[in-house]
Amino acid sequence: MRNFGIILAHTYKNRLMSKAFLISTVITLAFMLVLTNMDPYVNMLRGTSEAFSAAVAGADSIQVSPFDEPIQPSTSFSRRIARNTSLILMEESHLAATQDASGGAWYVEHLTDEIIVCKFKVILILNSVREYTDVIADSIFKLSRGH
């Protein structure tokens, strides 16, 4: 998904500095911070996802933080869950037994590249259509004004 940034930048290049975009981004980040504190169990999912990503990437060691650590001193339950997360991924998902856990990632990259090519073709078509519609609109405007 290395091309995701290219797609995102191209899609939002005109909107990134708009006032509405900045306000919505700030509100979204504030909600994320508040909701993390209101529901610390979501951090358990985040920790599992991070541990899985690290294992797939081939990390030598993985340390998962207790899910309630950002809001309070961790409990014995949260420490046990954090300790067992990597063990569960290793023993039950057999991530340590595979040679290349991300072996099929080339296909996702290929599909992403195809999406980018199709998106740029559509953008080029829309830009050419917009140029023609601008010319037609200008002509109609000039005709309506009697020029």
UniProtKB/Swiss-Prot annotation:
It comes from Alkalihalophilus pseudofirmus (strain ATCC BAA-2126 / JCM 17055 / OF4) (Bacillus pseudofirmus). GO terms for molecular function: cobalamin binding; methylmalonyl-CoA mutase activity. To methylmalonyl-CoA mutase. InterPro entries: Cbl-dep_enz_cat (IPR016176), MeMalonylCoA_mutase_a/b_cat (IPR006099). SUPFAM superfamilies: Cobalamin (vitamin B12)-dependent enzymes. This is Methylmalonyl-CoA mutase homolog. GO terms for cellular component: cytoplasm. Pfam families: MM_CoA_mutase. GO terms for biological process: propionate metabolic process, methylmalonyl pathway.
